[in-house]
């Protein structure tokens, strides 16, 4: 049984009883695109990090482990909390973690700061996904499959765009250019 505890949830529920709220679905899909695009930059810049810092494949694996642990294993716990205490502003808060992580990654001087950076990006994703899924479901107007599909298209498109943008921006211009991806986080915060 779903309980709505926040006035914003009640207003959204009333609004969605009349049908699917496409503007909200498209907004949440666009922010999902931006979120997953920023995440997918991380593995795309592994060759740059390996070359610049002389990392071993084990160190690259540890970077991946930290990112995956924070971006995926935290999600169920955050989702459980979000179900009990809906906080739509947590979407923007998650993007702030990602923003901070991208800036940190763009200036990180070595292995430990890079671990911190990818951990922050992963935490941002863990905070974003459960609440954004909940918002997509609330905006579905009962068309949950359609709503989830629109939401997922954004994430998949973003995951495909990130490596391409990394190849066009980061590889030619270096580690500092990762900071430009923070603009995507700022845009997502403004949309949210």
Language-model segments: which ranges?
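Short hydrophobic/alpha-helical segments at membrane-entry points of transmembrane helices
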Residues: 28, 112-118
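Cytoplasmic helix-loop-helix junction between adjacent transmembrane helices
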Residues: 117-154
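Conserved MFS/SLC helix-loop-helix module at the cytosolic interface between two early adjacent transmembrane helices
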Residues: 73-112
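Extracytoplasmic
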Residues: 27-47, 55-57, 78
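Residue-level signature of mid-helix packing/kink "hotspots" within the transmembrane helices
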Residues: 40, 68-76, 159-160
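Helix-loop-helix hairpin linking two adjacent transmembrane segments in secondary transporters
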Residues: 151-192
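Cytosolic juxtamembrane N-terminal segment immediately preceding the first transmembrane helix
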Residues: 2-31, 35
